[in-house]
């Protein structure tokens, strides 16, 4: 693959430079390679690879039977048959071109002295599709390689483009490898441009010079992020582009022998900064909120610092264990650039897959504990991938701020301890959980949130044809009143007692709250009261719990089964909790603002 060729070229250039020896690299450009390869050459290559006659005929029929017509002034020309080239965009085309080129690569590696990779391994050419390199230790061997290559392409309908070719030819001067600045090689009588000591050429998307591969930079990332921040898009659209298109564009370029931990960390820093700008998050927002997977309670922003080394480590392991003709074990075992790169990547990837780490960070950190339960049900996280119908960009941003603990309160860590008290006068820290779940100022808003959730479940039950009582009064014989949220009468004499509650996701599992809620009614006293109210019914106690930050816990599975709650209703309840969380916080802020002491009068100037 591309990584093998890149490592090979990097290893060769740096190894020869370290030893102060001569080396020669010629980058060849094939003029319109995929458009000019002859069809007989493709047929010959397939025969050489042992492809059976039936498959040969089938493949050739897709190529040789192609034709086009040109319409000029209302008149159509005769059929113009395509005699050369392969179809652009056809997934089979690169394979056909590669097998045509394979004969040349094999011939060069067998007949030419080539470049010394290890004491037992020499390679004269590196090829990937139409990206072709010639490697030679001695400059006197390069003309023979060029002549063989030109003759091979000429007989197959292809030609080289000397203007786009480049060469690096280094001589030994005082024990050092010094690249020549004057042209040394020709193609059909025309000189190939020498690169010298400062010029570069592109190979497989990476930049190479006489010193090896160039280090990746964050220049493009900085420019892309700046344009993204200025783009007239909604916040969810910007974040989608960042995650799905922009950051993945860096993956290939960062899988380079020149990559360092510092470059990867800078990419992560820039991505986090842009994410915070998109959602108006505080600077102190924990990285676990950003880098944890969506199913683990985060936003799913890929972390380059650990993801790229993990990818590279797997690819290098596959190379080392591979069965190709190149003995990668020898290359990685001898002292040299390839070995240094191999062990550097192993060190950078020593922590392994970052996903378990960030999941544990979500679970153990005080501001994010409980969000790991987003993995229990897709409804808890689907809104992050697809914005719910009817939501505005502001709604989405506020929901993200709620999930990441960024709705403004006095209890945030940057506040001094003596200033963290609730501004409503409560003897509690003004944390987000207190504002949404406990502050008397937001009591009526919490009741509205609860009633909306109950109404959704009751509507679903009535659609099923079940008789549904909302907040029925159930008296015990000693006068004690019970008032469950829902009493749902199902067929076969079953009565489901369902109580809806919104809890804060924290260190205490929501499953514990679910059990505690069930025991409020699943006891002998309520059973006696239920018999007096409804007669001899088969009682089923199954509460419905939701997290205040939009978590649908696994504990609700029995309730979902009993009431046949669909995915759409689960998602709707989660969206209700998220929107009401924003509304409750807004009501709290408006209330404490109205109660603030008046500003002191300004002094009157004399």
Curated annotation (Swiss-Prot):
Group of enzyme by EC: transferase
GO molecular function annotation: endonuclease activity; RNA-directed DNA polymerase activity
Reactions catalysed: DNA(n) + a 2'-deoxyribonucleoside 5'-triphosphate = DNA(n+1) + diphosphate
Any Pfam family the entry gives: RVT_1
Residues covered by the Reverse transcriptase domain: 1-208
UniProt-listed Enzyme Commission number(s): 2.7.7.49
Region of interest: Nucleic acid-binding endonuclease: 331-606
Keywords from the named record: Endonuclease, Hydrolase, Nuclease, Nucleotidyltransferase, RNA-directed DNA polymerase, Transferase, Transposable element
Keyword Magnesium appears in the UniProt entry: no
Protein name per its UniProtKB record: Retrovirus-related Pol polyprotein from type-1 retrotransposable element R2
Lineage, uppermost ranks: Eukaryota, Metazoa, Ecdysozoa, Arthropoda, Hexapoda
